[in-house]
């Protein structure tokens, strides 16, 4: 099997990242609506696993977003993000190695966490090194046990993925010590039970 970053580098060359953007948009907009609606002051933002940077570009157009940063481990994704947005902040780094110069108010991650063999370790790293006090982490995953349609993805894509149940994902957030944990299934339809969204805040 190949590493996830190798797969994503190949996908950029085939423009598959554009399809990912299209399919991820509804759930990401739901996640952002939930995260941003309570905010009444300026905030800072990181997209953990930013791909071609489309969420960062969107956030940079939000009047209250003072800083938006995209971090990704796939060089071709970061290169494309920089081509599409020459003034944006896009950083090539393994998420486990990255520590922002300043902690931020909101970290979003869509379809990323299950590519890590130890998602709880990544969550704790983000909690400790990325998020300010009262800051929020919100993630979305389509690869989880209750979604029967995803069970062959790892074999079909050719990269390792961590299969966890909905309860497992929620337990990771609880064990991390994050507060105000919420979870729901976003944007279900006749063929898909929905993106599993989990969120929590730093005390």
Model-predicted regions and their roles:
Residues 178-189:
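Conserved S-adenosyl-L-methionine
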Residues 108:
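A conserved beta-strand element that flanks and buttresses the S-adenosyl-L-methionine
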Residues 134-142:
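Conserved beta-strand signature within the Rossmann-like core of class I S-adenosyl-L-methionine
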Residues 142-160:
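Short, glycine-/aromatic-enriched active-site segment of Class I SAM-dependent methyltransferases
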Residues 1-38, 145:
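Conserved class I S-adenosyl-L-methionine
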Residues 46-48, 52-97:
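Class I SAM-dependent methyltransferase SAM/SAH-binding core
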């Amino acid at each position: 099997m190949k590493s996830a970053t190798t797969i994503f580098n190949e996908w950029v060359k085939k423009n598959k990242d554009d399809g990912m953007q299209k399919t991820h948009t509804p759930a990401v907009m739901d996640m952002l609506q939930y995260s941003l609606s309570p905010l009444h002051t300026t905030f800072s933002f990181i997209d953990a696993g930013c791909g071609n940077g489309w969420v960062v570009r969107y956030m940079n157009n939000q009047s209250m977003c003072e800083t938006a940063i995209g971090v990704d481990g796939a060089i071709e994704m970061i290169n494309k993000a920089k081509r599409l947005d020459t003034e944006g902040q896009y950083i090539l780094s393994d998420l486990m190695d990255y520590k922002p110069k300043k902690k931020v108010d909101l970290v979003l991650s869509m379809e990323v966490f299950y590519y890590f063999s130890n998602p709880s370790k990544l969550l704790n790293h983000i909690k400790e090194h990325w998020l300010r006090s009262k800051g929020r982490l919100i993630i979305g995953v389509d690869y989880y046990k209750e979604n029967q349609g995803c069970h062959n993805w790892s074999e079909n894509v050719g990269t390792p993925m961590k299969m966890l149940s909905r309860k497992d994902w929620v337990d990771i957030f609880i064990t991390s010590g994050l507060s105000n944990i919420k979870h729901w299934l976003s944007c279900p339809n006749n063929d898909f039970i929905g993106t599993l969204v989990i969120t929590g805040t730093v005390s």
